[in-house]
Amino acid sequence: MNRATLSMGVLAVVLGGWMWPVAARSESRAMDVSRSVLKIRVFKSGLFSALAHDHEIEAPIEQGAVETAGNPAVEFRVDARRLRVLDPELAADKRAEVQKTMDGPQVLDSSRFSGISFQSMSVEKIDAEHWIVRGNLTLHGQTRPVIVTAIQKDGHYRGSATLKQRDFGIAPVSIAGGTVKVKDEVTVEFDIVLAE
């Protein structure tokens, strides 16, 4: 089975304030969706990659919860239709083109596959600030196992993932006979805050 390994960082896929210090208190806590976000970084490649751009994409986490009673667990969901291409260096019309391609059937097909979600299967505490979370990530209608190494700092829980688009049934965009394209690997970054 394909496996993506999530490492400490920052996007920002796969996952946030899950059973960290709150694990000692048996309770379920929601994520603060006004401050919790997912980011995807897409990188250029190809012979004429100097003419292309890397892309930064962001969406709010739509809902999520942490269960600290019994077996710690975490789950969250992002609406793929709310992903937005940031790319401040691109002109508005070019940014709109990238957005349209990303949303369309060639890439995310977000009108058909609107849900991006993660559900943990096990949680292992490494030390006071670090955890390893094993679970399943669903993207583009495909579910794959992932391993998340997460870190807590200043009330935020951050992690990052390097995923292969092809593992989730997405063919990396390629134009001009492949002289300009994006890499199969993308970085997914998470910044998650628990609700008060």
What are these regions (language model features)?
Residues 1-10:
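Bacterial N-terminal signal peptides that target proteins for export
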Residues 22-196:
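Low-complexity, acidic/polar, glycine-enriched regions of mature
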